[in-house]
Amino acid sequence: MAHKSIVIFSVLAVLCHSASVKVPPIVDSSLPVKFSEVIAEPAPNVPSNLASYAYALDIYVQTTLSQLQCIKQAGYCAVFVRAYNPAGQGSFDTSSCVTIQNAYKAGLGIEIYMTPQPVSNKQGYQQLDEIIQGLTARAITVRAIWIQVTSPTNWPNNANSNINFINSIVSRARQSGLTVGIYTSYYDWNQITTGWSNIGNDVLLWYWNVYSGGVTGETPANFNDFRKFGCWTAPSVKQFAQDETVCGITVNRDVYLAGNVLKAVEEDGKIYAGGFVQGSLKI
């Protein structure tokens, strides 16, 4: 009888412990691995006395018009919308169309980024083609593309293969008349490409630097911590915060040089998105 009591108490203890454990929400797998289990918390307010920098958000979930209007009212000037989902073999993210259309209606600047799938049976340029075709079919014309090159564990352990994959996307973007940017960090770029420096001086840089996910892991919202790597001597955008909530959605926060982003425009019934971040701060 004593043995049975011990077993019962043990089971109850396990159940009680399980019930008290907080399970973190699912966070997008394209985020840096070490921050993938951070529970998002509300972001601080955007400063009202900005001079050199403007604030933006990068978003990977479908976002409503009311949420984007809230984002605009909160002091953000632009959104970076993910248009390619790396899950499986990778695919065009159809939900990005709704977010882009709503961002246009909210009066926000719009940039498009892709999280490619480097181990897919599709070449890099084919993945970009999917984005262009998918957005064009919905009356959205792409003028620029940002390519996410982060999380080295998601890439093959072969720098030459990775360089060829990235170059495939960059070359196709140039052929399509698009401005090209890379979203990466000093560490990621060196791990994935061993510091490839021949990507081209026309390619813009959006770098990330955070201490950890959440508000306490933010770095200063400026470019002062930038150090040269690859071919880049200056950045265009910095992601300084990850896994925070703004207007009820989980986002990452960014800054860029004030005055470099305009609203998306509509001509001939089409929305033209991307190509608004153009300049860089020479350091």
From Swiss-Prot:
Keywords: Antimicrobial, Immunity, Innate immunity, Signal. PROSITE patterns: GLYCOSYL_HYDROL_F25_2 (PS51904). It comes from the Eukaryota. One of its GO terms (molecular function) is lysozyme activity. Induction: Induced by Gram-negative bacterium S.marcescens infection. Induced by Gram-positive bacterium M.nematophilum infection. Transiently induced by Gram-negative bacteria S.boydii and S.flexneri. Down-regulated by exposure to Gram-positive bacterium B.thuringiensis spore toxins. Down-regulated by exposure to Gram-negative bacteria S.marcescens or P.aeruginosa infection. Down-regulated by Gram-positive bacterium S.aureus infection in the anterior part of the intestine. This is Lysozyme-like protein 7. The gene is lys-7. Plays a role in resistance to Gram-positive bacteria B.thuringiensis and M.nematophilum and Gram-negative bacteria S.boydii or S.flexneri infection and to fungus C.neoformans infection. Plays a role in susceptibility to Gram-negative bacterium S.typhimurium infection. Residues 53-273 form the Ch-type lysozyme domain. It comes from Caenorhabditis elegans. One of its GO terms (biological process) is peptidoglycan catabolic process. Residues 1-18 form the signal peptide. InterPro entries: GH25_Enzymes, Glyco_hydro_25, Glycoside_hydrolase_SF. Expressed in intestine. Expressed in rectal gland cells and head neurons. Disruption phenotype: Increased abl-1, fat-5, clec-60 and rga-6 mRNA levels. Reduced survival in response to fungus C.neoformans infection. Reduced survival in response to bacterium B.thuringiensis infection. Increased survival in response to bacterium S.typhimurium infection. Susceptibility to S.typhimurium infection is abolished in an abl-1 (ok171) mutant background. Compared to wild-type, mutants grown in presence of bacterium M.nematophilum are more constipated, the tail swelling is increased, growth is slower and they are arrested at the L3 larval stage.
